[in-house]
Amino acid sequence: MQIAALERCQKFRADLLLAHIFANPQTRSFQKELAENSGFSSAGLTADQARVQEHVLELLPMISEVNAVSEELNKYRHFELVLLGAATQDDNQTKVMVQMKDVGTGNLWLWERGKFMNRRYIIQEMYQQFLDDDESWKTCPKDKDPFWDEVEDYAVGTSSAFLQSLSYSLDFEDKLQITDHRGLEQGNLTIVLTPCDAKGQSLGEDDFNEDPNELVGKPYHVKVDVRDAEVYNSRFNHGLYVKYGCSFAKEAKDHHKTKVLTGTLAPSWKDSRMISIDKVTDEIIEIFETDSINFTVMAVQKPGDGSAPKVPYKNC
């Protein structure tokens, strides 16, 4: 609850900051001073937090500008800032991205900061054509239109399975909450982690160890089962799958993907994979004790028919 309240407070501050910036469109140094006066001081922040804050302050006015152009040109696209938590990133750094939404189909895209800034530049050129009564922008080919992008799979949310039970050769089974980038619940995902022998047979009760250090120097095997899920949003029924990687085994660090199941919001993948470690090290024990496997639930999106929504843009 405290985290949710903090996020609401930060969003409110961001909205206030954005209003001030547009009321006083001056220099970047002024924006920095204003940010500090609005509660965005960089004092006491980590390097990652300071970088994120700088990118947020940079992107907020750009996003507002692009949304205004989209509405003016009836492009039926809406943009918003998105923060992807460090825990879900391979480099353990928070990622600042921009989400584009097709307000007609509901399709979503996540753009890297650099891609958005490049698109914004082209959008500015398109808007200048509009202001100059140059109607060539209306016949811009789809693949040249800065508001268009290929439909791609979208991350519904992530679920984290903590690994501490593996330190004691114990099974882990849970129905985990699927959480999106806003921290909102989007469904649940059933995951099972089962320590096993080299043939994939589950360990017996006698194989339990009280001290994780007993595993050091020995081989270790674990089965990762992605069983089933329940997803709440009906627009994601075109196809659902799960992808994940395991930081404690070299051959499993790359993302493994389940099969895609279509036409359902309650997919049952029954996907099983055995991961083997040749020799447990102190580093692996540390991972077991403190880390998790992040499972990302992905949704297949379908392109629209190209027609504009039947309601005015401002009502979408």
Regions found by a protein language model. Name each.
Residues 48-51, 55-57, 70-95, 99-184, ...:
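Peripheral membrane lipid-binding modules
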Residues 1-68, 75, 194-196, 204-220:
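Long, low-complexity, serine/proline/glycine-rich intrinsically disordered regulatory regions
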Residues 225-235:
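Short amphipathic, basic-aromatic surface patches that mediate peripheral association
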Residues 161-217:
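Alpha-solenoid helical-repeat scaffolds
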Residues 211, 221-224, 255, 262:
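A structural signal for beta-strand and strand-to-loop patches characteristic of beta-rich domains
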Residues 206, 215-227, 266-274:
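Extended alpha-helical scaffold domains
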